[in-house]
């Protein structure tokens, strides 16, 4: 009986994933497409939950349904602005200062990444990881995020920070232009 209910749940989730994907593709209104994308992401998260991967399900909801879908809606709201003329863009001295500061910061980060002996760190962490016994897969994933996968994890957080700063700059420019 349990297998039959799991199979019915699987078919229902597949149906919602299919309908959500069709809604994303066929709706002319982009807001409705974003909402159907959220439905698709949520259905995939429930599918992960049905397959027994609770962590992946929660991560799907937090990252895709929460963050990515909200980001898409904000992008849609920003895209629907009238076109601007490129001759309106002028360079001011503060742009040169911020370019220099960002270039120095970028050069420092690249130098740190290149000069760090990553091979030694990874080999040392692999030995520690094999000797530990984790009680849950979530603890193992967390340990790997903060040990062997720390560089991609930090680069992803830096990318998200840059996107957030860019969104704030765009919003402030529009606020200044409106007043």
Swiss-Prot record:
Domain of life: Eukaryota
Keywords assigned: Chloroplast, Membrane, NAD, NADP, Plastid, Plastoquinone, Quinone, Thylakoid, Translocase, Transmembrane, Transmembrane helix, Transport
Subcellular compartments: Plastid, Chloroplast thylakoid membrane
Catalytic activity from the UniProt record: a plastoquinone + NADH + (n+1) H(+)(in) = a plastoquinol + NAD(+) + n H(+)(out); a plastoquinone + NADPH + (n+1) H(+)(in) = a plastoquinol + NADP(+) + n H(+)(out)
GO molecular function: NADH dehydrogenase (ubiquinone) activity; quinone binding
Primary subcellular site in the record, as a coarse category: plastid
Residues forming coiled coils: none
Keyword Chloroplast tagged: yes
Pfam families xref list: Oxidored_q3
Gene Ontology CC annotations of this record: chloroplast thylakoid membrane
Topological type in the membrane: Multi-pass membrane protein
Tagged with keyword Translocase: yes
Membrane-crossing segments per the record: 8-28, 30-50, 58-78, 98-118, 150-170
InterPro entries: NADH_UbQ/plastoQ_OxRdtase_su6, Nuo/plastoQ_OxRdtase_6_NuoJ
EC number of the protein: 7.1.1.-
Family: Belongs to the complex I subunit 6 family.
Function in brief: NDH shuttles electrons from NAD(P)H:plastoquinone, via FMN and iron-sulfur (Fe-S) centers, to quinones in the photosynthetic chain and possibly in a chloroplast respiratory chain. The immediate electron acceptor for the enzyme in this species is believed to be plastoquinone. Couples the redox reaction to proton translocation, and thus conserves the redox energy in a proton gradient.
Subunit structure of this chain's protein: NDH is composed of at least 16 different subunits, 5 of which are encoded in the nucleus.
The protein's name: NAD(P)H-quinone oxidoreductase subunit 6, chloroplastic
Organism: Chaetosphaeridium globosum (Charophycean green alga)
């Amino acid at each position: 009986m349990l297998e039959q209910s799991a199979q019915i749940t699987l078919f229902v989730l597949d149906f919602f994933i299919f309908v959500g994907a069709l809604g994303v593709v066929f709706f002319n209104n982009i807001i409705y497409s974003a909402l159907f994308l959220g439905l698709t992401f949520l259905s995939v998260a429930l599918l992960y939950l049905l397959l027994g991967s609770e962590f992946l399900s929660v991560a799907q909801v937090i990252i895709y349904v929460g963050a990515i879908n909200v980001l898409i809606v904000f992008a849609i709201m920003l895209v629907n602005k009238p076109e601007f003329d490129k001759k309106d863009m002028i360079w001011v001295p503060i742009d040169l200062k911020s370019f220099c500061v960002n270039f120095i910061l970028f050069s420092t980060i690249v130098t740190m990444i290149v000069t760090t002996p990553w091979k030694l760190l990874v080999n040392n962490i692999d030995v520690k990881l094999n000797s530990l016994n984790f009680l849950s897969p979530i603890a193992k994933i967390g340990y790997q995020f903060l040990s062997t996968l720390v560089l991609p994890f930090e680069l992803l957080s830096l990318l998200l920070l840059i996107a957030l700063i860019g969104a704030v700059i765009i919003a402030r420019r529009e606020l200044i232009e409106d007043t």
